[in-house]
Amino acid sequence: MLRELIATLKAVGKSTELHQTDDGTRLLILPYGGRILGVFAPGSEENFLWTNSALNSVESAQTYYASDDWQNSGGDRTWVAPEVDFFFPKFPNVDIAGYWQPRSLDPGNYELTKTNHGVKLTNRLNIEGFRSKKRVELEITKSVAAAPNPLRYDAAIRIDAIEYAGHTLLTSLRILDPDPNDAPLVGLWSLTQMPHQGELFIPTYSRTEPRIYFGLVDTPPDELATSDRLVRFKMRAAGEHKIGVRAAITTGRIGYIYPTGNQHALIVRNFFVNPSGEYADVPWTEPEDRGYSTQACSVNSRWGMFSEMEYHVPAIGEGTGLRQIVDRSQLWAFRGSREDIEKIARALLSYEI
């Protein structure tokens, strides 16, 4: 799968970089869109992340990249929030028919450079806030580093029985305009796309009812469940469904388990949550309802069939006095028997799994 994917992208003029960390993890980096398109365990050709089926052949990839639609290659991407400010040109009209992904953001104009520690992606862009009626010039940088198996010293986990891949992602957002307070409120937004038909877990410090952004109307009653320390979201329904959890409640981890052949895979995102920060993303119809750090979106529609784990970084710009913010997170991915994967999930996420 890895070699075929690289060959297909090369054939349609999309350059890639295959970066290997010290533990043998391989990351397929696609500058077009600033994506970490693939995460591969040592010796494995199977991607832990979702890629668009249009990339399965040169012919379909050529057609896809020639279209005027938003081109979602897949993998892990970085956007900016609040969504309602930057993705709705006709605000306050927030009808989904008017939704528009700013092309300066995605695919953007990312440049890849090699550093002493690995690779770095940089995108400079101008973007308009349709709600704030302010424009801002930004710089987004992304670089990767190793992330050793967090359970490598845990004797209770059968390390040799599983495949592991992981990396650290260092992302920065910088306002290039002279006065950051003249800029709109803007924050980093991380979105990781994974194969559909799995179950997502958000550990919490106490019981909470997730905010439903859209969907989850005619879905089975067990699709979304909460307990004292965990939110569970089965991502298998048709359509698009999204939830969010406030920063003060979340632990800074999200996990997702999905079947793959006769095995199961677990992906965990480990990130820093600062409840004192200004989490700017809001539900589309309630633009003052702030404070959500952690989100999840199930997509089974014309955009593809994938599950997203999402997190936000406190905003900079208007009213904050901040010009720059740097975020550091880890992605840990495991593949093995269902028993082993659930044991790892209980260790890293919640005993309730």
Where are these regions (language model features)?
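Surface-exposed acidic/polar loop and edge beta-strand patches at domain peripheries
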Residues: 1-166, 172, 176-230, 238-353
